[in-house]
């Protein structure tokens, strides 16, 4: 057991760690269909392999759609091979990764135990495909499809009800995030009210504006009922890279050779895009209690965005905006925007004062391949080791606790049992001291300038 440590004249309890970025889904198609209204079950099941709605960066394949774990691992192994990783070794690693360390759902309690083993006490749970065979049409149907609208709400409704059960299996430890379709605003508002009553408290996942036609930008008054419902029920508006942002013309512009890199590069911009529509559209003036979390999008971009918006606000055509906004763009960011820093790098942690210690949240991206399992505790030491204790308390847990409404006392009990302690993060570890696992290799920091470029 990990008890509280004694410091100079005071007790120093372990850190509370909330992963602001996690993903969960039903284990297979049959489990998912059990949650679909029988009147729509056949239509949802017949929607096919979802290849028409898969993000192009996956080459038209949704690795989370298959109910065959071997097929899922084969897709992931091919992706690793494209990054120069030995395919056979990748298959061996993925077989172990998806049976020992990561779990799509938690039918047998293994997921909760795996997270505690990694020093994680609670999670903000987004939908998404996961490597252990999980199925999550909700990730795509909420905003990525241009066809099959008749199955969108039955599929989303099914996922959301599964999510309520998933969260209820670990009370107070999982803040589920609600995917929505915004073409039917009345139904979206009803779903928010239902979700809050069902114990889903992680907020909503906002689709990017660009992925489906027929809807205005997020500055438009069309979304007023949505913002009002989020305020009323205390639901955070979440923008998650990949799950809530990609390009409408991706299929036309991306090809097999270039699509993977282009998709990964551009998806970050499309995920942030709703934020400046909301700021410049006066959404936060009309809804002062609204909070937006941008997750798995890095953290270094936010100070630059604020500087750019402030500059334009004062100069290039900013007069019309100044005439109706009550505050400056930077003020809205300071009051309403937080960042889910999935697998932050050390240099990002060292930017914490520039970005804002009170708006940074650590995310482990469990159970995705680019997450830190099973070396999460070492990664924490590398990223945060030796930094001020009070800053780490906020970034690792307190900011997420306050934003989403976790019970701090409950999580402190878990932290006392499993750590990490203050001593654990008092000193860091070098990058080379972290085992070179296939999963961690995808998230390891790289030089900002390549060796080839620096040699020229």
Segments (PLM) and residue ranges:
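Catalytic pocket-lining loop regions of alpha/beta-barrel enzymes
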Residues: 151-152, 167-175, 180, 186, ...
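Active-site-proximal gating segment of KS-fold condensing enzymes and close homologs
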Residues: 146-166
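Divalent metal-dependent hydrolysis catalytic cores, especially in the metallo-beta-lactamase
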Residues: 17, 92-100, 113-140, 173-180, ...
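Short aromatic-enriched loop/helix-cap "lid" or pocket-rim segments at secondary-structure transitions
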Residues: 29-32, 135-138, 249-252, 304-308, ...
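Short glycine/proline- and charge-enriched loop/turn segments
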Residues: 139-147, 254-264, 376-381
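Active-site metal-binding loops of divalent metal-dependent hydrolases
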Residues: 22-23, 365-366
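Short glycine-enriched loops at secondary-structure junctions
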Residues: 126-132, 241-247, 366-368
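Mid-to-C-terminal alpha-helical segments outside catalytic/metal-binding sites
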Residues: 2-16, 30-86, 90-117, 121-122, ...
